[in-house]
């Protein structure tokens, strides 16, 4: 398929229907390890689509959530070790830190002929740092939904689909491609586009630190601060920085592109946007280049490994998120959201 003049391999539901996916995986036991971020959405979608699915999860709140979602202890819900033992396809949907922690326990169950599935290329791409080196006699594949597990599940229930990338790291069986696409269709992907573990991992970490999360918070905060420093009220600064973007403009360029969004704004807005996008691009691109280099060399992966392995990681994370949540900009957001007509 043509993406901006570049031909890429894409698989759609039309050419690879659900019935074909079911036939390919009819004799497989799909063991979903981890019921945190991606686990609930992928496992429930597979179950609802008629596949043989079990879940592996350690006791705790997440285990209780799995029970609440209809997974039955001893029948479809097991320990991570027992699920890995029973599964012929092992879907490793644990966090990157958890994958590293359980790898010594998991590896004995990666016996010849099995398939190891990931939804992120982190553990394999930087396996010199993670220690996650799979046996050579198993298939190692990936389907990476381009969004959260919650979005994957919500869109599935709405009859829609979240796009996913796919990759094959090892094809010991000669059937890895069919299994990969079948699983991608089974979890509810809208369409699947080809990548590699390395490309997925580097683009994913770049996106999270860049325009999807890190950069957008930095950009929004900078504009909000400048407006506040120049006498604008919190509500005005927030509306002109965040609320108009998320509620009015993003739906426009999500639907038909940036040019269409520009075309549906005032001529004053159009002129200003066209004039200032260049200076912003020139200021931001060097930062993006620095970020990408830090990701590609493994530095960002090492930061994540070191940070997430500390015993007080969760406490420090909660403190950082608390500071973000209690900042003036995001406290203003709470009030603004309450004033939306649909919330009254």
For the regions a protein language model found, what residue spans apply to each?
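Gly/Ser/Thr-rich loops at beta-strand to alpha-helix junctions
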Residues: 35-40, 59-60, 97, 116, ...
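Small-residue helix-packing motif on alpha-helices
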Residues: 63, 83, 99, 234-238
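Rossmann-fold dinucleotide-binding core
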Residues: 117-209
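Active-site-proximal catalytic alpha-helix in oxidoreductases
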Residues: 174-229, 235-253
């Amino acid at each position: 398929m043509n993406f901006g003049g570049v031909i890429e391999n894409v698989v759609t539901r039309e050419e690879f229907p659900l019935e074909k996916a079911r036939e390919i995986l009819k004799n497989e036991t799909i063991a979903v390890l981890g019921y945190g971020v991606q686990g609930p959405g992928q496992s429930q979608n597979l179950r609802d689509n008629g596949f043989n699915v079990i879940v592996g999860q350690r006791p705790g709140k997440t285990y209780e959530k799995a029970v609440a979602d209809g997974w039955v202890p001893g029948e479809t819900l097991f320990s991570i070790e027992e699920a890995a033992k029973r599964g012929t396809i092992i879907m490793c949907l644990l966090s990157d830190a958890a994958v590293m922690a359980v790898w010594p326990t998991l590896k004995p169950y990666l016996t010849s002929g099995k398939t190891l599935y990931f939804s992120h290329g982190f553990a394999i791409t930087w396996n010199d740092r993670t220690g996650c080196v799979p046996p050579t006699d198993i298939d190692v594949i990936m389907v990476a939904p381009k969004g959260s597990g919650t979005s994957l599940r919500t869109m599935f229930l709405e009859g829609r689909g979240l796009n996913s990338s796919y990759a094959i790291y090892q094809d010991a069986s000669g059937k890895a491609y069919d299994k990969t696409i079948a699983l991608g269709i089974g979890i509810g992907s809208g369409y699947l586009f080809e990548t590699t573990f390395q490309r997925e991992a580097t683009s994913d970490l770049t996106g999270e630190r860049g325009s999807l999360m890190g950069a957008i918070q930095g950009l929004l905060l900078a504009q909000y601060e400048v407006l506040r420093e120049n006498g604008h009220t919190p509500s005005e600064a927030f509306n002109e920085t965040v609320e108009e973007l998320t509620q009015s403009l993003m739906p426009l360029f999500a639907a038909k592109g940036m040019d269409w969004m520009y075309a549906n704004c005032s001529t004053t807005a159009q002129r200003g946007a066209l004039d200032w996008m260049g200076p912003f691009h020139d200021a931001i691109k060097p930062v993006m280049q620095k970020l990408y280099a830090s990701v590609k060399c493994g530095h960002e992966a090492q930061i994540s490994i070191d940070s997430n392995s500390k015993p007080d990681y969760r406490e420090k994370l909660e403190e950082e998120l608390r500071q973000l949540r209690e900042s003036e900009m995001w406290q203003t957001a709470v009030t603004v959201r309450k004033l939306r007509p649909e919330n009254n």
